[in-house]
Amino acid sequence: MTRLASGVLITLLVALAGIADGSRDIAGDILKLPSEAYRFFHNGGGGAKVNDDDDSVGTRWAVLLAGSNGFWNYRHQADICHAYQLLRKGGLKDENIIVFMYDDIAFNEENPRPGVIINHPHGDDVYKGVPKDYTGEDVTVEKFFAVVLGNKTALTGGSGKVVDSGPNDHIFIFYSDHGGPGVLGMPTSRYIYADELIDVLKKKHASGNYKSLVFYLEACESGSIFEGLLLEGLNIYATTASNAEESSWGTYCPGEIPGPPPEYSTCLGDLYSIAWMEDSDIHNLRTETLHQQYELVKTRTASYNSYGSHVMQYGDIGLSKNNLFTYLGTNPANDNYTFVDENSLRPASKAVNQRDADLLHFWDKYRKAPEGTPRKAEAQKQFFEAMSHRMHVDHSIKLIGKLLFGIEKGPEILNTVRPAGQPLVDDWGCLKSLVRTFESHCGALSQYGMKHMRSLANICNTGIGKEKMAEASAQACENIPSGPWSSLDKGFSA
């Protein structure tokens, strides 16, 4: 291996290890015993209680969205397929489940089990039977918003299914992909921005076409999508894989314990996602509340105070007293498996930073490929292309900060984090404009570059506009790199 390859490998290993801070406390000390929580919420916790035992009260609806493509992002579509199987076993009908996924994983040439997707090292196929509602180029922001709003006339392509809900219905939305401060990835064209998503949820509430809505969100910095934006009073309860400033984590990854079967070179799931689904898989969900699951997922996703993230909750927290059955149904096979602490907390899972999972895939693919084969050469090329793109984006953003604010003030302004409870940016239109300006001169941010959204938001918050940003970007980037990660073939991300 060349010196450069060795150096990059060391960089990768350091990145995958993360930064351990022995003083931090991810899980905190607020985990109640499930029995105590159950008594609190059912014997005087306050507020109106949904009759979770009455199937005749409203219809359950679900929207499941995997926002990525590419085999290195296997885990996101695996999460979504697993969620579909869980909901079907819970009694939801296909007509009430809308699935968005690119669908390039099951029959991908990299898949060691063609036509099969697994979400656990010893798991069953979760791909079989999943409806192809919106796949490929139909997985767009516009179609997702139209589906949530029940706007059939805005749809072309796909199955045409929408959330055609009524005032007594309950809606569950689950998203899994990469994210960044204020933004969620999509496999086509532009990304989902927090202000637009919140506007859609407000419109859905104003229509009077649901009784309550639960949103589970798997992405890096996912707390920033709701923090300071999702207000009480919309009958919406949301939990996120991480707070507004940190990465979420992939799990069941190569080299970890437990890891995927040896023929796999990619992570099978995401830590927050498998935490809530593996909990739901084994319990009678008539006896478990959203709050109980939140606490359990919070503990497991924190990896018991090692590597992990802070699971957060937003919106109408009072809805968390509702049983999961209200949104997910329940598998009759679990009728005798009441939620109690002794059978709920699973062993800790090792995890990989969400943004490093693609590098891990390329490295594992390279490591396993026989010497001198095209596969080994391809893996090496993919690895170096990804690393080169990362270095380009990081350098460009840092240089733009210094050009705009000076060598000393630049890093300080770019890295500023607003106090908890405040939204990421004052002017979302400015943020989107600066994203387009940066990408016009420097190339696509990509799933990795989304991490710099806070820096671009901070530039907006200082009053810098499009013209000054264009001038600095032109100085920082003489041209757009030719690699696939920088390509703008699919358009701008804003």
UniProtKB/Swiss-Prot annotation:
High levels are seen in the flowers, a lower level expression is seen in the leaves, while very low levels are seen in the stems and roots. It is an enzyme of class 3 (hydrolase). PANTHER family: HEMOGLOBINASE FAMILY MEMBER, VACUOLAR-PROCESSING ENZYME GAMMA-ISOZYME. The record marks C267 as: Required for post-translational maturation and enzyme activity. Disulfide bonds join C253-C267, C430-C460, C442-C477. This is Vacuolar-processing enzyme. The active site is at H178, C220 (nucleophile). Coiled coil: none annotated. Glycans are attached at N151, N336. Keywords: Disulfide bond, Glycoprotein, Hydrolase, Protease, Signal, Thiol protease. The keyword Signal applies. Residues 1-20 form the signal peptide. It holds the Pfam family Legum_prodom. Its EC number is 3.4.22.-. GO terms for molecular function: cysteine-type endopeptidase activity. Asparagine-specific endopeptidase that may be involved in processing of proteins targeted to vacuoles that accumulate during ethylene-regulated processes such as flower opening and flavedo degreening. One of its GO terms (biological process) is proteolysis involved in protein catabolic process. Belongs to the peptidase C13 family.
